Amino acid sequence: MSLRVVYLGTPQFAATVLKTLLDAHTHIVGIVTRADKPQKRSSKLISSPVKQLALSKNIPLLQPIKTTDPAFLAQLREWQADVFIVVAYGVILKQELLDIPTYGCYNLHAGLLPAYRGAAPIQRCIMDGGVLSGNTVIRMDAGMDTGDIANVNYVAIGEDMTAGGLAEALAASGGELLLKTLQEIEAGTVRHVPQNEAMATLAPKLTKEEGGIHWDAPASQVYAHIRGVSPAPGAWTRYLSQGKGARRLGVLSARMESFSGNYGDPGEVLGVSGEDLLIACRQGALRLRMVQPEGKALMKAKDFFNGQSRLVSKLF
């Protein structure tokens, strides 16, 4: 493939896709990623996964503070790219940048556009009980995920799949979809199909508060919520701790109880069942497996219950 490609991306998802392109000998002439960020508990700067891969391959790298900076835009022009590929870069790009490459900018979106436009298509699709996801490649315009569709593929969402697991599956197949698109661009056969605006939905970035579990819902819905916010921002609930009032309890893994009848009041702790802690939902029940009490280490849910002298009777 002779196309000169500039790649813009930041997290592990983007690094996985980039590796697929590099393994296929795509001519990456430059890479753009976000500036290094300090660790939460120290001042040490952490490089993005895309930066680490770029450095390991000795590919020219830019980390602009602002993508509108004239010096940065001048450097992009010097790379004389035929096409820009954008994967989870993390910034909405202005038209001046989009106009630089000969054939335009193409974005790999981890969702089936026009549904789930925004930063969290993977998480919100699972939280909504979705059973099918996929990648969409669009030719970018100045809007948020509004460009014409060039290619689509599909990935089934397994009944126990978390957002982290779906992200891995989409990244693995997304690189192949981009390779197909680049081949079509080079051959002059790529198609651009306008999105159906009537079908558009939004998927804004999740907040930590959205990880909160609402037990007054069917167990299937609660389970979808937990899977959708795993690993980030993470699911949580509350319990009453003797002498300490309401405390948060992180829920890191759970599974559905096979019997779907009514067990008790929503959030009621029904006790230990095997290795799990059984919690009633509005319909059915959920088995908590691994939890993390506020200020404590990760532990088995049954050990948390036993360690509280079995005084925890309800989650809320």
From Swiss-Prot:
Keywords: Protein biosynthesis, Transferase
InterPro entries tied to this protein: Fmt, Formyl_trans_C, Formyl_trans_C_sf, Formyl_transf_N, Formyl_transf_N_sf, Formyl_transferase-like_C_sf, GART_AS, Met-tRNA-FMT_C
GO cellular component: cytosol
Molecular function GO labels: methionyl-tRNA formyltransferase activity
Xref: Gene3D superfamilies: Formyl transferase, C-terminal domain (3.10.25.10), Formyl transferase, N-terminal domain (3.40.50.170)
Catalytic activity: L-methionyl-tRNA(fMet) + (6R)-10-formyltetrahydrofolate = N-formyl-L-methionyl-tRNA(fMet) + (6S)-5,6,7,8-tetrahydrofolate + H(+)
Signal peptide: none
UniProt-listed Enzyme Commission number(s): 2.1.2.9
Segments forming a coiled coil: none
PROSITE patterns per the UniProt record, alphabetical: GART
Cysteine disulfide partners in this protein: none
SUPFAM superfamilies: FMT C-terminal domain-like (SSF50486), Formyltransferase (SSF53328)
Keyword Protein biosynthesis: yes
Sequence positions that bind (6S)-5,6,7,8-tetrahydrofolate: 111-114
Family of the protein in this entry: Belongs to the Fmt family.
HAMAP family registered for this protein in UniProt: Formyl_trans
PANTHER family: METHIONYL-TRNA FORMYLTRANSFERASE, METHIONYL-TRNA FORMYLTRANSFERASE, MITOCHONDRIAL
Function according to Swiss-Prot or TrEMBL: Attaches a formyl group to the free amino group of methionyl-tRNA(fMet). The formyl group appears to play a dual role in the initiator identity of N-formylmethionyl-tRNA by promoting its recognition by IF2 and preventing the misappropriation of this tRNA by the elongation apparatus.
Protein name, per record: Methionyl-tRNA formyltransferase
Source species of the chain: Chlamydia trachomatis serovar A (strain ATCC VR-571B / DSM 19440 / HAR-13)
